[in-house]
């Protein structure tokens, strides 16, 4: 998986690796000028001022204390630091009770419904039974789009009329999932741009609906579009404040020239990237491999 993931990412991250240009930079003598240039290049890769500042503060301390003396020592140190940053969030394990319930949160246009469909198809291919819930009752044709994915994944679908209460959809989906004894219930949600108070209330209501059935929510995924850069960072910050996130599904990483934004997203959301989209095909939604990603972004 790591090799395929690395190859899938390497092409898409060419602009990021070119912006970093570490091969040439780290062949020069290690001094303050080189460290300043490295800091500038990390910022150009969209790793974010706060993250880069913390990273460079640690590197400068290593340099001043002479723990790092040569430029050739910087790349291994940098790889270790970036890998640790991506692994800071806990990976959760699903409960043994059925159905395993997964929520998908995020604003409109980031690929939420597509992510539900692709992950559902993967689960179906592994022999699991599925139910999809069309919790986005506000977007025109949202249920129809999810029905298309349900057909492809071999999943059943619970949906209500357009403009209905999302929590009512969740309620009926929980009832159906338990009665039909399906393995997984995947819940698509509305992606309107909310204010924080309304978003918190809507999320809390849906989560309470699940709890009233005596069920446990195993995953709350935040779906983000890597190509939107700082907008995705702000979304990560907002949703982390209103929902108990368990992981990030990152779409359109193949089309983003700013691959460094991943580090900001993990920092703001406080959870790890779990899946990443590197293309349009169903099989292009991959398990996120932190080591392969760091190797790809620092490729010389």
Model regions and ranges:
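Non-catalytic terminal/linker segments enriched in charged/polar, low-complexity residues
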Residues: 1-104, 119-121, 125-132, 152, ...
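P-loop/Walker A NTP-binding module and the surrounding RecA-like catalytic core of P-loop NTPases
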Residues: 83, 92-300
């Amino acid at each position: 998986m790591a090799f395929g993931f690395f190859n899938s990412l390497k092409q898409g991250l060419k602009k990021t690796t070119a912006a970093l240009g570490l091969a040439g930079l780290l062949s020069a003598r290690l001094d303050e000028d080189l460290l300043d240039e490295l800091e500038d290049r990390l910022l150009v890769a969209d790793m974010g001022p706060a993250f880069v500042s913390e990273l460079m503060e640690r590197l400068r301390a290593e340099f001043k204390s002479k723990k790092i003396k040569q430029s050739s020592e910087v790349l291994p140190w940098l790889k270790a630091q970036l890998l640790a940053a991506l692994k800071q969030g806990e990976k959760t394990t699903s409960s043994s009770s059925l159905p395993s319930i997964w929520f998908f949160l995020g604003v409109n246009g980031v690929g939420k419904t597509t992510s539900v469909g692709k992950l559902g198809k993967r689960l179906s291919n592994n022999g699991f039974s599925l139910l999809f819930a069309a919790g986005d009752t506000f977007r025109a044709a949202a249920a129809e789009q999810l029905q298309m994915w349900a057909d492809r994944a071999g999943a059943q679908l619970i949906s209500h009329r357009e403009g209905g209460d999302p929590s009512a959809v969740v309620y009926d989906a929980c009832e159906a999932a338990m009665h039909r004894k399906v393995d997984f219930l995947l819940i698509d949600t509305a992606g309107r741009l909310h204010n924080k108070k309304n978003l918190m209330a809507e999320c809390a209501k849906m989560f309470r609906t699940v709890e009233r059935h005596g069920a446990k929510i195993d995953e709350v995924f935040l779906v983000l579009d890597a190509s939107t850069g700082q907008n995705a960072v702000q979304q990560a910050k907002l949703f982390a404040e209103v929902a108990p996130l368990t992981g990030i599904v990152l779409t359109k990483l193949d089309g983003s020239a700013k691959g460094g934004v991943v580090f900001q997203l993990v920092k703001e959301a406080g959870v790890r990237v779990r899946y990443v989209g590197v293309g349009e095909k169903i099989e292009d939604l991959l398990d996120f491999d932190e080591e392969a990603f760091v190797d790809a972004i620092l490729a010389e």
